[in-house]
């Protein structure tokens, strides 16, 4: 029994030593693990600090198509405006021809005499300016024909004159404003003369001359003058106040009965 116990006691420390050696070897064999923070994981990639947005530049093909498009749009708009102008002109001309045909088909009674007067006045102007300059050859027939039309159609002439006058006035105002703006710009560009600096002595003399003279005596009214004289007399003289003995208050006693009361405190 003693030998069995001794063997048991010797085997237990040996087993513990062997087990501790195995555990240590296993720990040494394990690879060393390093802890990583969450922001260091690859899913948390932070953008660079000096980032800058660069807009994509168009290529040669894109720029070529853009230039072709702008050119075609410009010419298409120009052709469209010309087409609309010609269309409106043709439509107005056709409508005017239709109205003139209807008017001439059934003219009023005084139409032919009025047209005869206008034509005769135009021919008279042409004959009167046949030996003159080109300006006279144009101005005289138009002027006399206009005068004849004004005489024959006074109401329409007044309306046309009003409209023409308003348009001429608006145009003259625009021209006047343009000329005025140019004139103001020229005047602003010109250097203004600098004012001369006055000396301090001259300024002080002017200030003294502009201020009123306060040393002169001012006349007061009679009431204020008498009040000031009375106050001055009362303050200048050393008058002594003498009270009336009848008005003196002696308390509970009369001056004649002063011996009847004791003066002890």
Curated annotation (Swiss-Prot):
Residues 246-265 have a biased composition (Basic and acidic residues). Residues 229-241 have a biased composition (Polar residues). Residues 1-27 form a transit peptide. Residues 28-110, 156-265 are mitochondrial intermembrane. The chain crosses the membrane at residues 111-129, 138-155. It comes from the Eukaryota. One of its GO terms (biological process) is cristae formation. The keyword Ion transport does not apply. Keywords: Membrane, Mitochondrion, Mitochondrion inner membrane, Phosphoprotein, Transit peptide, Transmembrane, Transmembrane helix. Its main location: mitochondrion. Residues 187-215, 229-265 are annotated as: Disordered. It is found in: Mitochondrion inner membrane; Mitochondrion. The modification Phosphoserine is found at residue 204. The keyword Transit peptide applies. Residues 130-137 are mitochondrial matrix. It is a multi-pass membrane protein. One of its GO terms (cellular component) is mitochondrion. Belongs to the apolipoprotein O/MICOS complex subunit Mic27 family. Component of the mitochondrial contact site and cristae organizing system (MICOS) complex, composed of at least MICOS10/MIC10, CHCHD3/MIC19, CHCHD6/MIC25, APOOL/MIC27, IMMT/MIC60, APOO/MIC23/MIC26 and MICOS13/MIC13. This complex was also known under the names MINOS or MitOS complex. The MICOS complex associates with mitochondrial outer membrane proteins SAMM50, MTX1 and MTX2 (together described as components of the mitochondrial outer membrane sorting assembly machinery (SAM) complex) and DNAJC11, mitochondrial inner membrane protein TMEM11 and with HSPA9. Component of the MICOS complex, a large protein complex of the mitochondrial inner membrane that plays crucial roles in the maintenance of crista junctions, inner membrane architecture, and formation of contact sites to the outer membrane. Specifically binds to cardiolipin (in vitro) but not to the precursor lipid phosphatidylglycerol. Plays a crucial role in crista junction formation and mitochondrial function. This is MICOS complex subunit Mic27.
